[in-house]
Amino acid sequence: MNKDEVVVSLFAGAGGFSSGFSQAGLKPLFGAEINADACQTYQENVGSPCHQLDLSTVDPSHIEMLTGGKRPFVVIGGPPCQGFSTAGPRNFADPRNLLIFNYLNIVERLSPRWLIFENVEGLLTSGGGRDLARLVREFVDMGYSVRLQKVNLAAYGVPQTRKRVLIIGNRLGIDFQFPEELYSFDSGKAKKASGKPLAPSLAEAVAGLGPAASDKDALVPYASSEPVNAFDARMRAGNRVEVVTHHVRVEAAERMQVELLKPGQTMKDLPPELWHESYRRRANRRVSDGTPTEKRGGAPSGIKRLHGNLQSLTITGPAAREFIHPTEHRPLTIRECARIQTFPDKYRWVGNNASVIQQIGNAVPPLAAERLAKHLRDIDGSFGADTRPAGAMSAKLLGFVLTEALGMSPALKSTEALLAEMHQGGFVF
């Protein structure tokens, strides 16, 4: 990496975003992450320091010091953003706002050439759309020309339908587009037939792994000496020991229910008398504090059997308990979840099983991150230089895509109206 191409990873987690950037030749100078296990996992794999920091309170000047005073090419990562749309300008009185406002202060202090912000789909409608609109307004006021898009990462080759909100911005005053989508996808729930080849299926993602072990410390050999498909080859690359960890069979608590489920079915497809008690309790639970979540506060579906010939549903922390293998009566193993998230088999995980699956579920898939990193290199005409091209425009919201569906919910329409107003030069807090 050129000495001028500084990458900083905030909210770095276990290093998924950073690993993908490293694969594209843009290894971060450092990561910053509050969780000790995730920070150590990052260091074990990314090959650059991870500073265990509380980004809600750290002084932005400290982050600037860690860069050696160099202006970054890009800052990657994103904090939770709930509840800050009604706060005053960078007002830290509400503790929920500490992370997002200090994140913005850090970005402003570092003044990177590019930024990539990633968050869950629920951010689209958080605070009636004003949380997202406020965030975009902050970036524009800092001098960034930004595009916002809800992206399904399966379109970039990830073997799961993982919807994420991405904001990409630059200080060059240039327009740009998101990376071209390379794949169609179908998880049985989310689907897009674009005429392009299907993204790798769940079965393709876990192919080549040997039978799951019962011993929690087992080193499990591959099912064959050679990779069985292109995705398996990518996952095996660099794993010199020819065995994998975290490929351990765990019996489902709801064994009888699991055996009755067909691919694509969930607990709610079973007769109510077979519902597990924990599912009954959770079915009545809602998120009450406005925090954007995977399911936007909706009721969970409990266990679900996945389709082997389709892409997986979104891998999150509970996946190793709730996602049932397509053909075996057991949940997915942690290793299978890691592969579906495109973490290679050589990746070394730090922490107990609960910590590891949470790290995996929280991560940006390295394969998607690599695609984004390569795209930045392609669209940045004078890569790494601190110059503005001739004809540069003023900072603005360049465009946004909230959904590809034909209809919109009332909540999403509210967000669209706010962003449309901003796109036309309005919307001031």
Curated annotation (Swiss-Prot):
It is an enzyme of class 2 (transferase). The active site is at residue 81. It comes from the Bacteria. Residues 5-383 form the SAM-dependent MTase C5-type domain. Residues 282-305 are annotated as: Disordered. One of its GO terms (biological process) is methylation. It catalyses: a 2'-deoxycytidine in DNA + S-adenosyl-L-methionine = a 5-methyl-2'-deoxycytidine in DNA + S-adenosyl-L-homocysteine + H(+). Its EC number is 2.1.1.37. Transmembrane segments: none annotated. Pfam families: DNA_methylase (PF00145). Gene3D superfamilies: DNA Methylase, subunit A, domain 2 (3.90.120.10), Vaccinia Virus protein VP39 (3.40.50.150). Residues 282-297 have a biased composition (Basic and acidic residues). One of its GO terms (molecular function) is DNA (cytosine-5-)-methyltransferase activity. PROSITE patterns: SAM_MT_C5. Keywords: DNA-binding, Methyltransferase, Restriction system, S-adenosyl-L-methionine, Transferase. Belongs to the class I-like SAM-binding methyltransferase superfamily. C5-methyltransferase family. This is Type II methyltransferase M.ApaLI. The gene is apaLIM.
